UniProtKB/Swiss-Prot annotation:
GO terms for cellular component: cytoplasm. HAMAP family: NorW. It comes from Vibrio vulnificus (strain YJ016). Pathway: Nitrogen metabolism; nitric oxide reduction. This is Nitric oxide reductase FlRd-NAD(+) reductase.
């Protein structure tokens, strides 16, 4: 019997890959190594647990054991892969060696916590996994005032959800506006107004200098001298790919594990996908590219030829009172055709040559997102 495919990780990317492989081959041996219990859950739901009053247990779709049985895989739960021996084609976990025919890194990413001072750093929570929510669930449910570090996609969604659930919320963001890496300024401003309508306090152009325990509360000092007394601090300041084992194994690693359009790393027997992978220089921490990557990689693993093609992809900002959808490419140099109304905004980006390169729609106009995405895709293919 040939050595199995080994997948390191049990998040969305890993399980999407397993499902894709099993659609092509019901019997090829697969082993999954995961540091947690391997439960299947929908990670984007973590941004909306407070308004829905969901516990960590509510988010579990299937236990790790049930997933393994259903998809005919061997699950090594609570088993950390310590090293990869590329010459021998083995992984080392808990001191034992396990051989592989092909190895897949689906190790995801960890929440990035910016450098701060103070004796309260251990109380700064993150919400990047089911296990992290389990740890944060009780402190956050008791908290009346929550400070969110980071005004990007996840930070904004969580802040609005916390406010909707009745909590006082302060967002600290180092950029001059929210979602600075995603949205043009004329879209970010109405979003900021919506958040302030929900009572959310915004500290833009700011960063947290220190977190100090003061009795039952946390004293937060910003770099500009402002101070807040809060009950909880939640950090949503971006992600950092989990690449340590891959780097130690000698694989090419930059911001993520470097892969080509076949999801192959610098080792012909090793692949990577999901939040840990850097595809042709790009980090793509969204669900759609992971699904597309899983389909391509599944074919590779069963001996078929496939290459990843990435169409224009939609990004949704799930802020119910002011929904935003966007796709394509735009930059500070883009020219914009903008349609404004009290119901929302339709904005189309054009290059200096007048080519349609991307769009943003908000409010009630999110219904126009798919026709615009279709138009964008047709132009990209044309």
């Amino acid at each position: 019997m040939s050595d199995p495919i080994i997948i390191i990780g049990s998040g969305f990317a890993a399980y999407q890959l397993v499902k894709s492989v099993r659609r092509l081959d019901a019997h090829i041996p697969i082993q999954i190594f995961t540091a947690d219990d391997g439960a299947e859950y929908n990670k984007p739901d973590l941004s909306h647990v407070f308004s829905k009053r969901q516990t960590a247990a509510d988010l579990v779709v299937k236990s790790g054991e049930a997933f393994a049985t259903e998809h005919n895989v061997q699950l090594h739960a609570h088993t950390q892969v310590e090293r990869v021996l590329t010459q021998q084609q083995q992984v080392v976990a808990n001191g034992r060696c396990y051989p592989y025919s092909k190895l897949v890194f689906a190790t995801g990413a960890q929440a990035f916590v910016p450098p701060m001072r103070g004796d309260g750093l251990a109380k700064v929570m993150t919400l990047n996994s089911l296990q992290e929510y389990q740890a944060a669930e009780q402190p956050l449910s008791r908290a009346q005032h929550v400070l969110v570090i980071g005004g990007g996609l996840i930070g904004v969604e969580i802040a609005l959800d916390l406010a909707t659930s009745g909590k006082q919320v302060t967002v600290v963001e180092p950029n001059a506006r929210l979602l600075a890496n995603l949205l043009p300024e004329f879209i970010a401003l109405p979003l900021e107004q919506q958040l302030m309508k929900h009572g959310i306090q915004l500290a833009l152009n700011s960063r947290v200098e220190s977190v100090t325990v003061q009795g039952q509360t946390l004293a937060i000092a910003l770099h500009d001298g402002r101070e807040f007394a809060v009950d909880a601090v939640l950090c949503a300041a971006g992600l950092k790919a989990n690449t340590a084992v891959a780097r130690e194994a000698g694989l090419s690693v930059e911001r993520g594990i470097c892969v080509d359009l076949q999801l192959n790393t610098s080792d012909p027997h090793i692949y990577a996908l999901g939040d840990c992978a850097q595809i042709e220089g790009r980090m793509l921490p969204y669900l759609q590219p992971i699904v597309l990557s899983a389909n391509v990689l599944a074919k590779q693993l069963v001996g078929q030829e496939a290459r990843l093609t990435l169409p224009p992809m939609m990004v949704k900002v799930k802020t119910p009172s002011y929904p935003i959808q966007l796709a394509g490419d735009f930059s500070p140099e883009s020219h914009w055709q903008v349609q404004l109304s009290p119901e929302g905004i339709v904005a189309k980006a054009q290059s200096s040559l007048g080519d349609f390169t991307g769009f943003v729609v908000t409010g009630e106009y999110v219904t126009q997102a798919f026709p615009l995405l279709r138009e964008l895709s047709q132009r990209a293919n044309g």
